[in-house]
UniProtKB/Swiss-Prot annotation:
Matching SUPFAM superfamilies: LDH C-terminal domain-like, NAD(P)-binding Rossmann-fold domains
Gene of this entry: LDHA
Name of the protein described by the UniProt record: L-lactate dehydrogenase A chain
Species, as recorded: Pongo abelii (Sumatran orangutan)
Statement: the UniProt record of this protein carries the keyword Acetylation: yes
GO biological process, any: lactate metabolic process
Disulfide bonds: none
């Protein structure tokens, strides 16, 4: 007896189902799921895989997304504790790990998360040896280094979300002050994602008009308008949101989808992301810090050489020294 499906549909070919634009998100906490929904709403993948160790939560999140399939254009959403569900991914986004507690610095999380990465990274590499790795877990600069070391991948394929969000926060606050949309407010926050990030005041502009030229005291202590406060707010913003709602999720999710778009569509847009910076700005150790990078299908293909003041360069170097101090003690 022919089934209803057989009566309705005449099959023409047996297809082998290898996804062309598969994205995996490892970790289905608040950040992982914000990344997932942001990616789904930008139609970046033909298959989305979710991985976590908590199986009930994982299955629930997968089902909840699948139930929205009518409103999405990602035909396949899968999940599993076993990394075989991640096979053939173009991009693997790591959000798993211990989360920052209220008042805890990102650097404090480090050894807890290194131990988690020792399990995750080899499994990702086993099933998607040609993928790009996008690291989001904190402290992101150190964990991007850890992922690079464990994976054995070339440095262009290991990317930290880095200061992409810090710069977005900076541009939002700049826009609020000026009454201009953030996309027309240009400004870069570089270096460590977190407390020692470096705002590049000389590069701040709207429509190519340098703010520093109009207002030479910009970013200095003698600035009557206290623009330094804008960067201070960027640094404090995550702590404030964590204090208020317990974690951050939406902005980092959107920021990660922005990076994923540049990679999946080979856009070659410039983003402040964490990359191996050894040999630049007098840095001699294997550290990852955010500088403006060109992002495309091979990950980071090039970086932009930003002209920094001696003070900015010194701050970058100090970040590098701090990170290396922690990295050289790590056990993995």
């Amino acid at each position: 007896m022919a089934t209803l499906k057989d009566q309705l549909i005449h099959n023409l070919l047996k297809e082998e189902q290898t996804p062309q634009n598969k994205i995996t998100v490892v970790g289905v906490g608040a950040v992982g799921m914000a990344c997932a929904i942001s990616i789904l709403m930008k139609d970046l993948a033909d298959e989305l895989a979710l991985v976590d160790v908590i199986e009930d939560k994982l299955k629930g999140e997968m089902m909840d997304l699948q139930h929205g399939s009518l409103f999405l254009r990602t035909p396949k959403i899968v999940s599993g504790k076993d990394y075989n569900v991640t096979a053939n991914s173009k991009l693997v986004i790591i959000t798993a790990g211990a989360r920052q507690q209220e008042g805890e610095s990102r650097l404090n999380l480090v050894q807890r998360n290194v131990n988690i990465f020792k399990f995750i990274i080899p499994n990702v590499v086993k099933y998607s040896p040609n993928c790009k790795l996008l690291i989001v877990s904190n402290p992101v600069d150190i964990l991007t280094y850890v992922a690079w070391k464990i994976s054995g991948f070339p440095k262009n394929r290991v990317i930290g979300s880095g200061c992409n969000l810090d710069s977005a926060r900076f541009r939002y606050l700049m826009g609020e002050r000026l009454g201009v949309h953030p996309s027309s407010c240009h400004g870069w926050v570089l270096g460590e994602h977190g407390d020692s990030s470096v705002p590049v005041w000389s590069g701040m502009n709207v429509a190519g008009v340098s703010l520093k030229t109009l207002h030479p005291d910009l970013g200095t202590d003698k600035d009557k308008e206290q623009w330094k406060e804008v960067h201070k707010q960027v640094v404090e913003s995550a702590y404030e949101v964590i204090k208020l709602k317990g974690y951050t999720s939406w902005a980092i999710g959107l920021s990660v989808a922005d990076l994923a778009e540049s990679i999946m569509k080979n856009l070659r847009r410039v983003h402040p992301v964490s990359t191996m910076i050894k040999g630049l700005y007098g840095i001699k150790d294997d550290v990852f810090l955010s500088v403006p990078c060109i992002l495309g299908q091979n990950g980071i293909s090039d970086l932009v050489k930003v002209t920094l003041t001696s003070e900015e360069e010194a701050r970058l170097k100090k970040s590098a020294d701090t990170l290396w101090g922690i990295q050289k003690e790590l056990q993995f």
